[in-house]
């Protein structure tokens, strides 16, 4: 949401298909949505190139997949990730979140095989309110973590 960047009214994951929260985007102009979608697609593509470092995308078909995020307010970013993963036909899809409001948990649970959410507060303002430091990860931090997974252990489905 312009001016409230932590509140996701939509998201774009790998593959570029936008997922919009229709209830929230009614306050955003079509031009803003189109421009933001183009900008976010470019950023997702940039991150994929940087983070993969020439490695192919991991095949998820027939695999068990666990999607993890630092929390979900509207669930838009997680819905985009779910959509991107579902397109690859995993055997099982689990979402794990430390914090999300009840309505978001209920909505996400309908889209996955299992939803794990540690804290589901009745009163919820933002994901960041539950963290002492809610700074975003830098590209360098992400690359360092991914580099440590050069030869990840494969676990059966």
Where are these regions (language model features)?
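PRPP-associated nucleotide enzymes
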Residues: 1-157
């Amino acid at each position: 949401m312009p001016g409230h960047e932590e509140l996701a009214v939509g998201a774009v994951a790998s593959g570029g298909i936008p997922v919009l929260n229709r209830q929230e985007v009614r306050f955003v102009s079509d031009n803003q949505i189109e421009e933001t979608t183009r900008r976010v697609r470019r950023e997702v593509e940039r991150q994929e190139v940087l983070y993969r470092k020439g490695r192919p995308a991991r095949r998820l078909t027939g695999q068990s997949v666990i999607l993890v995020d630092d929390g979900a307010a509207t669930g838009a970013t997680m819905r985009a990730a779910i959509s991107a993963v579902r397109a690859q036909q995993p055997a099982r899809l689990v979402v794990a979140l430390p914090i999300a409001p009840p309505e978001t948990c209920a909505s996400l649970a309908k889209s996955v095989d299992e939803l794990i959410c540690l804290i589901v507060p009745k009163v919820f303002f933002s994901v960041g309110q539950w963290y002492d430091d809610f700074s975003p990860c830098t590209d360098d931090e992400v690359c360092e973590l991914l580099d440590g997974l050069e030869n990840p252990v494969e676990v059966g489905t």
